[in-house]
Amino acid sequence: WTLPYGPLMSIPPVASYLILHNTFNLLPADSAYHIPIILWGVIGIAILYVFLKEAINARTALFASLFLGLSPRYFGDLHNNMKDIPSAAAFALNMWLLWRLVNHKRLIDLIVAAIAFAVAFNIKVNSVFIPVIAAAWFLYIFLMHRKSFRPTRFVPYFFLAPIFAFLLWWVFWPDPFGQLRHAFLTFGIGTNNIEVILNGAWYCSGSTVPWYYPYWYLVITTPLVILGFFLIGLMSLIRHIRPVSILLLLWFFLPLTRYFIPTIGVIDGIRHFEEVLLPLSAIAAIGLDRLLSFARPGLAKLILLFVYSLLLITIGVYHPYQIAYFNELVGGAKGAVGKYDLDYWGT
């Protein structure tokens, strides 16, 4: 038995199916199987909230968690996608723990951050970008705070994280080295030659898909209100640079750089880079918070009521096919017909 990704995301759905359906017959088979996926998605929202509450403020944290939870594509995948939702949640956990490592500088934070990477790696190989983000962020902090920065507090992370990841990997696979090679090879070629349609043009995954595919798809599948606040937040982060600002920017942009390599496969819209929806929501929340800081209390409440009511209505209109959501830039799902894939898992 072999899989081109870590086994951790497969265990909870199967266990839930065996317990809640086979053993006690409490739920239909599909519902029992999907409950852990929903929990993963909710945990991802909760992690984003806690992280931003500690790093920025509670209001921004609340805005971000609502943006994420009411993003149609995330909401849809949360009910069906057993790989990419757990991967996104684990990615968020790692970003929060890296932030805690830098801010608290304790041995326990170092160990927990390394263990979190092990868990993320054993969910999906997308997690290889976590230490890349960590390295870039630590380098920034070193350059900006050379006098107070102590490399000995952070360098061990880059040794412990891969060691812990491989030890956990070893537990699950009889041929851990061969399986590791299989995972990395599949990361690049697992979707080769699958047809991909983008704006009415046909491409082949792993060879001809353009580098801008992820950015294009994020623009057309993110609700316009979130997209607008994201742009405001992006400008705010660039104007007011702080360590947490750099971390959010790295979290959003670095994982997408892999698509500059034409041989990296991508299909099914945003699901292969779902981890960037969390920093996108965070940056949008910063933009909303920034806008509200200029508004009177009454106007601020009206803005919030309009924004979140619109998102909630969108979720309701598309239910249960939120995976097929496209925004007004392409004319919604109707305008996307013949130009984009409208369905994959669960639709």
Task: Describe these PLM feature segments.
Residues N94-L110, H240:
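Membrane-interface transmembrane helices that cradle and orient dolichyl/undecaprenyl
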Residues L3, P7-I11, N22-A46, S65, ...:
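Loop-to-helix entry region of an early transmembrane alpha helix in multi-pass inner-membrane enzymes
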Residues R73, H79-P86:
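Short acidic/glycine- and proline-prone juxtamembrane loop motifs at membrane-interface regions
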Residues A64-S65, D109-K124, Y217, L256:
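Membrane-interface alpha helices of multi-pass inner-membrane proteins
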Residues I35-A55, L93-L97:
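Transmembrane-helix motifs of polytopic, lipid-linked glycan transferases
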Residues A64-G69, G76, A92, W96, ...:
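Short helix- or helix-capping micro-motifs
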